[in-house]
Amino acid sequence: MHRLKSKFSHLALLLCIAPPAIGAAPRSITELAPLATISLGKTADWVAITADAVWVASTGPFAVHRIDPKTNTRIASVDLPGEACAGLAIGSDSLWVPLCTTPTSLAKVNLTTNRLEAIFAVGPAAAEGGIAFGAGGVWLIINESADLARINPANGAILRTIRLPPGSYNPTFSGNTVWVTHAKGADVTAVDAATGRIIAMTATGLNPRFLTAGAGAIWTLNQGDGTLTRVDARTKRARTISLGTPGHGGDIAFSEGRVWTTMPEVPLSLIDSRTDRLLCQWAGPGGDSLGIGHEAIWLTDYHAGTVERIAVADALAHCSRRGHFH
């Protein structure tokens, strides 16, 4: 890490910290009545959404499940040789599933046939990592040295590796750039997908892990201090706001000008990307991973092994009423 800091001493780590911007006291998650609750296994985690499906992983069984958003029913389950432990990604007509097998591995699920197509001998560096797809490749941190690998989706071959700060685990792809949070630090690294060159390191809140892209920015959910950092994708300038949600786990997604986050005990938070303002929070049981699509929030309850479908319109309507937790 010291070597990387020296190499990029000419790059400013720009961070503007804003005070909490909470529009209302936390509400109860029970006010959001699910349109459907789908039981998947002992635990449910990780959500990926396509134009015609919602995919969610489980343990007990080790599997990924395809849900039809038209009927809110599970229409396929694909058994896996181990736990899906580091996110899900969509690309090249496939669902990509990092597995905490021994040794770790990468599953490729065919989105057309709903079948396990391949298991590649490359896998995630750690649980709670992530995976991304972009520029025709799969992107994954593959070891504790934090080598970011670009993987050939056809055969699982590693095409290139880029050394990042140790403790970096979670990538996302946006605008021909791979962004990777430094979960054991307080920064995010931008990598040019075409050249493999590190082009920026930007300060964030403490222990950023899960991240998403939208509104010309990268958004990091920071586990160490319960904050959210917005990094301008062009200027690399950052602004951090308080969410009051520190802790392990969690997830983040962007849709239609809004950022949604989830953490255990605070299953849902809503942030306006235009103002960087925390509009509403819902507290209570459940939460841990989410996806936004098909006019719905797909929210897992990890320990219950379920995923709920909550209408975005319902959440927005309740938020506009500015009620309080009860």
Language-model features and meaning:
Residues 2-12:
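Bacterial N-terminal signal peptides that target proteins for export
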Residues 16-326:
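Predominantly soluble domains enriched in secretory-pathway, periplasmic, or organellar proteins
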